[in-house]
Amino acid sequence: MGLKSFGVLGNPIKHSKSPLIHNACFLTFQKELGFLGHYHPILLPLESHIKNEFLNLGLSGANVTLPFKERAFQVCDKIKGIALECGAVNTLVLENDELVGYNTDALGFYLSLKQKNYQSALILGSGGSAKALACELKKRGLKVSVLNRSTKGLDFFQNLGCACFTTTPKGAFDLIINATSASLNNELPLDKEVLKGYFKESRLAYDLAYGFLTPFLSLAKELKLPFQDGKGMLIYQASLSFEKFSSSQISYSKAFEIMRSVF
């Protein structure tokens, strides 16, 4: 039985649970796949060329995380699915010697929501994950607003039909989503009092970070607001990615059950 190498590309990367859940699937489904896959955490220098790194490492597939999702979009030979709309790639697969980019963050996020009847969302941040979420939520009919500290990247969201802000907008939002890297630095993405104001009129606080009670989620808990971390999104997007890695031999629902059992 042959070996194939996969990984997750990011900086930082040591916090990632992707190797744990993907390796569980590769071990479980090796007979169906006809190969044993091994999935590594790969720390890349910030200036890395994603395609060159992928090819030089001899990878068959990879996930892409902070801060490389938009850069990965730019270097693929082909882009498929919703990644075409959201300008960000979190899944790379070598298909017929071409580097093909997908985005499973978008659907992964939506599937992870325990309720689906939200009308509006405020996304904090403007990076690759924020783009994917905005595309998916707009597609589902939500009114989406984006708040970022600078105007960098906001053109994309304006073209998508989102309301964009660099200072805190007035109003209430059903969903408050932290798509910034603030939680990885143990910080709040917004001034505490401003965030409190939003939380008091919100229905759910969602942080894309996972594995610990972030300052963002801790504040929501303090205010008795329902909250959710990024664990569910991680497992859904990973299972959707695994379906791509397996050339659709293993459905995402089968992969999801294995991943959920180990994390």
Swiss-Prot record:
* SUPFAM superfamilies, alphabetized: Aminoacid dehydrogenase-like, N-terminal domain, NAD(P)-binding Rossmann-fold domains
Is this entry keyworded Oxidoreductase? Answer: yes
Metabolic or biological pathway, per its Swiss-Prot or TrEMBL entry: Metabolic intermediate biosynthesis; chorismate biosynthesis; chorismate from D-erythrose 4-phosphate and phosphoenolpyruvate: step 4/7
Q: Name the positions where shikimate binds.
A: 16-18, 65, 90, 105, 210
* Protein origin, superkingdom: Bacteria
Q: Give the InterPro entries listed for this entry.
A: Aminoacid_DH-like_N_sf, NAD(P)-bd_dom_sf, Shikimate_DH, Shikimate_DH-bd_N, Shikimate_DH_fam
State the EC number(s).
Answer: 1.1.1.25
Q: Which family does the entry's similarity section mention?
A: Belongs to the shikimate dehydrogenase family.
Which NCBIfam families does its entry note? aroE (TIGR00507), PRK00258.2-5 (NF001316)
The entry's protein name is Shikimate dehydrogenase (NADP(+))
Q: Which organism is it from?
A: Helicobacter acinonychis (strain Sheeba)
Q: Which gene encodes it?
A: aroE
